[in-house]
Amino acid sequence: MLKMGSNQKKTYREQGFLNGIDLFSDDEISGYRKQFDALEARLGRETCQIGLVNSHFEERFVWDMATDPGLLDQMQDLMGEDLMVLGTHFFCKYPVE
């Protein structure tokens, strides 16, 4: 099981979130990005910017990301063994044109 560092745990307790957690390999990130780009091509940029809520029900790659063993290990280290995926949501920050 991957463990969080004490500084990360402290940040999570104080701020309620963490960022910059290194979970996925470059190849995994590339694969997820390709799948997201295909989803964006189907649904449109506006929908993908804020409207991808609970897409893990329809999109296997979102489910795979949300249930990644490395992610679950990290979350269990922070929150305990019993976890449940309540929802997924993409927040896409596109460049201003």
Description of each model-found segment:
Residues 1-15, 19-97:
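Non-heme Fe(II)-dependent double-stranded beta-helix
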